[in-house]
Amino acid sequence: MFDIGVNLTSSQFAKDRPAVVERARAAGVTGLLITGTDLQESRAASELAQQHANFCWSTAGVHPHHASSWDERVAEQICELAARPRVAAIGECGLDFNRNFSTPEQQEAAFSAQLALAAELSMPVFLHCRDAHARFAALLAPWLDKLPAAVVHCFTGTAEELESCLSLGLSVGITGWVCDERRGLELRALLPQIPADRLLLETDAPYLLPRDLLPKPTSRRNEPCFLPHIVRQVAAWRQEDPEWLGQKIDENARRLFRLE
């Protein structure tokens, strides 16, 4: 089972990153994709991936929260990072109109530029969309025939938005959000609609600790070692065998990100 979304560069992991990786291995996780969210974090993610060869890969990109930092210099350096052997996708990029830490105009410019970069480099894209689906889809659609693959990470949208993502040919990343009895029930009901070959699972650690973990962890910090719990829960809600699903999401991740 492959975790396609781990924020391993987070300061929350500063004291025990090697142990976090080893706990994931011990839990049966077969690989991690470390998320890059700005130039500095993308560089750090790449370096971590190189330290854990054959288990970790990374993305390189600028999250919509940081879109105001996007300029020609950043674009050039993201392009250079993308050439590193363990960088598997451009991103995390997209739109987030929930908080607008960068203006919508800045977000759209950075998103479009990163889609163009991914198309130029023939790399998959690791996508973010929150409260912005119409513009997200409109900006993304013209690029899809030029991109090898795309996954919308941490999907928490509506039935209509899921249908739109699937019609665009996107793969869908599901996190422990779906384990939340307060806000994950709508998403849980949508799980059977996602084709098995388009489903990816992720922890988004250290965020989104599954609320139904038993016994409850003493810390609220999420870790990739909890991915097997998400796999078991999603398998139950999709009425699939958890071992089969774990293998399937590993195959999906390795195919989508073209991992050796």
From Swiss-Prot:
It comes from the Bacteria. InterPro entries: DNase_TatD-rel_CS, Exonuc_TatD, Metal_Hydrolase, TatD-like, TatD-type_Hydrolase. NCBIfam families: PRK10425.1. GO terms for cellular component: cytoplasm. The keyword Metal-binding applies. CDD domains: TatD_DNAse. PROSITE patterns: TATD_3. 3'-5' exonuclease that prefers single-stranded DNA and RNA. May play a role in the H(2)O(2)-induced DNA damage repair. Its EC number is 3.1.11.-, 3.1.13.-. It is found in: Cytoplasm. One of its GO terms (molecular function) is 3'-5'-RNA exonuclease activity. This is 3'-5' ssDNA/RNA exonuclease TatD. Its cofactor is Mg(2+). It is an enzyme of class 3 (hydrolase). Pfam families: TatD_DNase. Belongs to the metallo-dependent hydrolases superfamily. TatD-type hydrolase family. TatD subfamily. Keywords: Cytoplasm, Exonuclease, Hydrolase, Magnesium, Metal-binding, Nuclease. Its main location: cytoplasm. SUPFAM superfamilies: Metallo-dependent hydrolases. Monomer.
